Amino acid sequence: MALLEICCYSMECALTAQQNGADRVELCAAPKEGGLTPSLGVLKSVRQRVTIPVHPIIRPRGGDFCYSDGEFAAILEDVRTVRELGFPGLVTGVLDVDGNVDMPRMEKIMAAAGPLAVTFHRAFDMCANPLNTLNNLAELGITRVLTSGQKSDALQGLSKIMELIAHGDAPIIMAGAGIRAENLHHFLDAGVLEVHSSAGAWQASPMRYRNQGLSMSSDAHADEYSRYVVDGAAVAEMKGIIERHQAK
C-alpha cells in the first residue's frame, strides 16, 4: 500500500496528521519559504508526543540550495541534533554552483546522520541532470527523493517521476507538490509507492485585536492573521483513497 507523508509546520499539525491516518510526518517551519529547519523546542515537543515516524527538514534558509560555509556548518549541527533527539530520519539536500549534488558536503551530512534515513528534498527539482543526480544519490546511500518531476506540481511532472522510478530501485521516489485527494488516483494508478502532501488550509488567527496599519513581514501585503494548518479531514480522505485503491 502506498505510504502517505504529510508536511507539518507545528506539533499540533503533526498530531492532526497522525490522528487522521498519516504514515509519516515531514516536520518544517516557515511554509511560505517552502519549509525550513524547525526550532529546537518544536523538535523536542514533537519527539515527545508524536508516535508515527517524523523526519525533520534541515534547511537553514529559503531560496537556492548552494550554501555558504556558515550555513553548511549549521546544517551539520542540526543533523547531529536531530540524530541525538532520536528521530528516525531527516530531510535535506545540497547542490553545487552548477546544479549538481554537492558530493563532498552530502558525504559529510550522511556521516553525521549515521543510521538515520535521509530524504533528499526538492533540491532535486532544481538540479541540472536528474538521472545523473539520482545515480549520485544512490551512491551516497540516500533512502528517498522527494520530487515533483522538476515541474511546478507533481501531476505535471508525473511522466518524469515515472522515468525516475523506472531508473532503478533506490532511492525510493516520493512524489510531492500539489498532491490532493482529487488527483491522488493518478499517482496510485501509476504505481507511485510514496506520496507527500501538505493537506493544508489557511486558518484565521484567534486574535480579536488587529493592528491593520502595521506588518511584521517584509511583504506589506502578507496576511499575518492566518496560519497554515493540516486539514485532518483532507488527510483522512487521502488515506481512505489509498486504502480503497489497495483493496482493488
Swiss-Prot record:
Q: Which UniProt keywords apply?
A: Cytoplasm
InterPro entries per UniProt: CutC-like, CutC-like_dom_sf
Q: What protein is this chain from? A: PF03932 family protein CutC
- The yes or no answer to whether the keyword Kinase is present is no
The UniProt entry, under HAMAP family, shows: CutC (MF_00795)
Organism in which the protein naturally occurs: Escherichia coli (strain SMS-3-5 / SECEC)
GO MF terms on file? copper ion binding
Which Pfam families does the entry link to?
A: CutC
- For this UniProt entry, what is the primary localization, expressed as one broad class? cytoplasm
- Top-level taxon of the source organism: Bacteria
Q: Does the keyword Magnesium apply?
A: no
Q: Which GO terms describe its cellular component?
A: cytoplasm
Q: What family does this belong to? A: Belongs to the CutC family.
Describe its assembly. Homodimer.
Compartments where located = Cytoplasm
